[in-house]
Amino acid sequence: MSLKRCRALPVVAIVALVASGVIMFIWSQQRRLIYFPSAGPVPSASSVLPAGRDVVVETQDGMRLGGWYFPHTSGGSGPAVLVCNGNAGDRSMRAELAVALHGLGLSVLLFDYRGYGGNPGRPSEQGLAADARAAQEWLSGQSDVDPARIAYFGESLGAAVAVGLAVQRPPAALVLRSPFTSLAEVGAVHYPWLPLRRLLLDHYPSIERIASVHAPVLVIAGGSDDIVPATLSERLVAAAAEPKRYVVVPGVGHNDPELLDGRVMLDAIRRFLTETAVLGQ
């Protein structure tokens, strides 16, 4: 063995050791890198809309989750939307969205997952799925809500939560804002050197589930989204069954106001829901 090769071996070993250490750290801390909850406190629902109510959604595993409920104002049982948030913050960051959706004539349930907004527990794929099921049950049980006219709205990671819920409990319509195909694929956009498919504890495989959704689907993407590229959203809607719609908001990034309560997005949602049982006559 040459002297040069002898010197190279320790360098290779050090690089391998460092890489292994980085991978082990990421594996052990991955949920801290996926979920970014705000601990609260969260303001009252009535500070957003006068008729808003602070509510508690209880999951099957005993979690008591805080939420906001904004009932529609038309009287009787009517249409509603369940909002599944993205991976960061809490429901207060979606107040403008709640007001905008309520303005379409919908009752709105905006809740926080476990670990978010002062709620107990720690977030995980299984936990968020349980939280969404509990929220859907709560909303369906309200006297002013027609269970046959409930839409789901999912934002980013929440879109994956909404897809999973829609497979189990089909809504009247499914609206997905900035959805990805799977957590591994969106992660690969940002960390292409990591073997994410092997490392991830949570997968959110929406691309494998979307064809099993038996409801009209609207996908909305930002044309300049550098967190969840529109190409991933486009692939997801391509895998969905008809009827489906795909809307790109040009020049808009993942967290821009246009994807919170922007006119293009809201007009697309209004037109779409009017074609479904949610707002259709």
Swiss-Prot record:
Coiled coil: none
The keyword tRNA processing is assigned to this record: no
Subcellular location: Cell membrane
A Pfam family: Hydrolase_4
SUPFAM superfamilies on file: alpha/beta-Hydrolases (SSF53474)
GO cellular component: peptidoglycan-based cell wall; plasma membrane
Membrane topology: Multi-pass membrane protein
Transmembrane segments: 8-28, 97-117, 147-167, 210-230
Main subcellular localisation: membrane
Transmembrane recorded as keyword: yes
Listed InterPro entries: AB_hydrolase_fold (IPR029058), Hydrolase_4 (IPR022742)
GO terms, biological process: symbiont-mediated perturbation of host innate immune response
Family matches, as PANTHER family: ALPHA/BETA HYDROLASE DOMAIN-CONTAINING PROTEIN (PTHR12277), XAA-PRO DIPEPTIDYL-PEPTIDASE-RELATED (PTHR12277:SF79)
Homology family: To S.pombe bem46 and yeast YNL320w.
UniProt name for this protein: Uncharacterized protein Rv2307c
